[in-house]
Amino acid sequence: MARTDAMAPRTLLLVLSLGYAFGFNEPLNVVSHLNDDWFLFGDSRSDCNHINNLSQQNYNYMDINPELCKSGKISAKAGNSLFKSFHFTDFYNYTGEGSQIIFYEGVNFTPYVGFKCLNNGDNNRWMGNKARFYTQLYQKMAHYRSLSVINITYTYNGSAGPVSMCKHIANGVTLTLNNPTFIGKEVSKPDYYYESEANFTLQGCDEFIVPLCVFNGQYLSSKLYYDDSQYYYNVDTGVLYGFNSTLNITSGLDLTCIYLALTPGNYISISNELLLTVPSKAICLRKPKAFTPVQVVDSRWHSNRQSDNMTAIACQLPYCYFRNTTSDYNGVYDSHHGDAGFTSILAGLMYNVSCLAQQGAFVYNNVSSSWPQYPYGHCPTAANIVFMAPVCMYDPLPVILLGVLLGIAVLIIVFLMFYFMTDSGVRLHEA
């Protein structure tokens, strides 16, 4: 009986049938977009201009394809992040607009920096601030096209001026807090037990993200303990936003912030004791859009520096898709820049896809062996996500089509198996 090593046509047909039925259109672990209406916010790993500051002038420090540098769809600054620019004097004017928003930043404010507002403060409080900031930011950018950072002016009728309360130097990084602004104690007051107010106006944006912060604990000054309390009062609507100190602690005391989404209007900042704080910067949100989940790429150092998972905590379904690798960050330019795994994730920005989902991006919109979870776009076997519900509304037609195709695949497999068995029996009989 003759024998051949080549794959018989019928065997090849069987393999292709199985591959089509069980491995077609798998989700890709990338960030991508459905069309050209997208924008990326980043740091040095996507800052095309940073090459001018380097001794080794090549683009290996970036995790994006250099071809994207001329796209006009990136706002990024080496050494910075949206959180740093929002709170500190180290400022970059992050500005961008798009329907599909991608974030790849945050690593420049981690436990490696170890920021503390007070000498005996607690960096964990600031990690909590970071998580709350990005939670509000991601949720809002699922509903708005445009993001920018703006300054806020205020009017204070007292004689005291702004004071620097929070400054920290670590690992060569100096950070000075300037949002919110602290108003100093009036010289006519013997202590901090007095009420003070300042006026500020929010205008020019659809919504504003502003900080409301207190020292959550017993603040000691001149042998007296103070319970911090801060309020923002909307003069136009009568709505009062408040944040009070609730912890009975004296050590590990640090500034704790919540992040409010305020509408345009006239506001009064109020303090009942301790220092009055006034927002000096805001995230300006403009141009409402249909609900579109944002995409976040994990932003972390090589393991020789301490990182955090605050952006992962902030990025939750259904408003956010989180993308990550399973290995350590290991750059080629240096240990913290140019990682192959993250470059692979960002490579999805070079092309359009049909569908974005929890599992990844689907290139095609017909049939997939993986059922898209929390899908957005033209997705295989599923229609667009319905917001306000943690489940997907599915179009029955693709489901029927999938069932028909799977049924055909099963019939083909059964037929081929029967054919092979019959053919083998004939061959054995002839042999």
Swiss-Prot record:
It is found in: Virion membrane; Host cell membrane. It holds the Pfam family Hema_HEFG. It is a single-pass type I membrane protein. Residues 132-274 are annotated as: Receptor binding. Residues 11-131 are annotated as: Esterase domain 1. Residues 1-21 form the signal peptide. It comes from the Viruses. Residues 275-387 are annotated as: Esterase domain 2. Its EC number is 3.1.1.53. GO terms for molecular function: host cell surface receptor binding; sialate 4-O-acetylesterase activity; sialate 9-O-acetylesterase activity. Belongs to the influenza type C/coronaviruses hemagglutinin-esterase family. Structural protein that makes short spikes at the surface of the virus. Contains receptor binding and receptor-destroying activities. Mediates de-O-acetylation of N-acetyl-4-O-acetylneuraminic acid, which is probably the receptor determinant recognized by the virus on the surface of erythrocytes and susceptible cells. This receptor-destroying activity is important for virus release as it probably helps preventing self-aggregation and ensures the efficient spread of the progeny virus from cell to cell. This is Hemagglutinin-esterase. The gene is HE.
